[in-house]
């Protein structure tokens, strides 16, 4: 099979795998969304019991961030406007600049051109497909045989990191990691302009993905690989690679530059810097988290029906602890064999080890990461991306080299260790079953007997079976290893069995993590929402009390909140409404809100256009203009004078001001930002900050009505658009450059060919070992 036909065959197989994983949402009419978490609120619960459990209650961010932001971006772009400003959150906030809105993410084009919510599943599927196909190309470029490259390409989209973060912008950025290393290798070896341009496009795609921390991890991985190849790459190779990185950052300037300006106006950077421990402190390694790299559901999860033991044991949630999962067989068998191959595979193994040490807080790597500027304020738990990536690649290499287990004396002792662990796991399963009656009895005597009994019941139903399943898998692997070592199992059969065990393990883990819900559950109706549309229609605002209507929930229904569910917020609006929130260590509008806080901040809430507060508990008497109960929820209306309010919002205000015999100040209840501009009768005037928080324009006396226009037009966006255009032009020039156009002049660098001393696994009999038609690896 030619390389092109093999790539097409793999692309089809990968598409079938992704379709099997997400089939309910892609073809059966369901919606890939965790939006049923809204039923946990009294406002949406309806006739469901208070104990209603969503399909995956951990996945709240996609509902409160990415889905409403995607819909907002789509509506604005289809209306012919760049989504610069969002008036429906946080008294108005920058939208394009918040980074995670991912306005230019290539995957989101599916939603811009298609329909929602159907596009949500296709976006997720495209992320997985791109990640898998990129891994296949990288594995083929690095010389893996047919078994190895197919395994790597099919396993990576099923790994813990890609599956657990699938509905986050994290996955959009991470999907380009294999492509980045593939393009990096091409740039170091080919040293052509087109190689540099290809790398630039990949880097830009990752940056546009909407999670700059993950892209930083992608670029650091690329840089570490360059260090391992620095001698063979030469000056021209390094120049080609650096130029590609520079072009990529330049293309993504419209994503990166506004984010930088937004961070400068937000307290998040300072809060994270102060909350991080000293680089010299020695943290306690999160070794219990690391166990999830082998058994992701060891402590259960927040999926429906599963026990959630993580919090009680001090373990992080599933997304943070199990991101490095790549299959039990990959971890214990294939990856160790692959790491023994030396060369670049040893470098891949080092990347995985460093990622694990950083992700699980093991000194001295954890200390080093805290000492590096910028990296010190990123969430390095997400370095499990490196762990999963390395395990999958090494697993592919190990699958190709699986017969090497017959020659390694240590491998026999390693298999014995599997058997011991399998016995321990089986014993653990039996112990949990034996302790069942005692645990149930203790639960019934607990202060919260119903809740405790529910948790114990889940643990008894799930944990023994899960531990027993892991024990059976290890036992099966030990049996296969024994057959291989005795020569009773040939290479193809061994690869097929072990590869299938690993892929089935990954598929079983991944299936159902991202719920497919009924279409009616994606945007549930609520009499509370219907009433708010009457008493507080946009552009008026609402604030939720307690657990009701978390920030950004109302965006889903076209309403506005005075809070913002985002890690980056404007310091001005947070200071303005500081009295609303209960004290907390971080300055964020996700802090708890109580009725007492609403009373403290009532005057400023009114000045900000907040018309109502909603809570599941009854508000104190005498504090509000009117109070009504809608089902199980109370709606309190804030009385008093209202500010002038003008439409349409979202970065544009057009106002007709009545005549006035004296000068006056026009105040608009929207957060002040230096990017705002104003015109009175077509003449530009200064925009000022009222109380250091709200928009204000000073107007002279006038006998006639005046037209006032305000536009959000930050200069950094205009500058960065120009820079992105220049970057795209450079990339286009590189792609159309002649194939022989290389960086630098002068004599070519030294080239060394690695001799192939034994047949490469998967090579056809009589096929060439060199040149374009070679079936084996050619290292240059």
Which role fits each region the language model picked out?
Residues 1, 169, 175, 183, ...:
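Contiguous transmembrane helix-bundle modules in multi-pass membrane proteins
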Residues 25-142, 148-176, 285-321, 678, ...:
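Active-site lumenal/periplasmic loops and adjacent helix-entry segments of GT-C-fold
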Residues 132-142, 146-230, 240-259, 265, ...:
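Membrane-embedded helix bundles of polyisoprenyl
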Residues 3-94, 263-267, 511-514, 521-523, ...:
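Hydrophobic alpha-helical membrane-insertion signals
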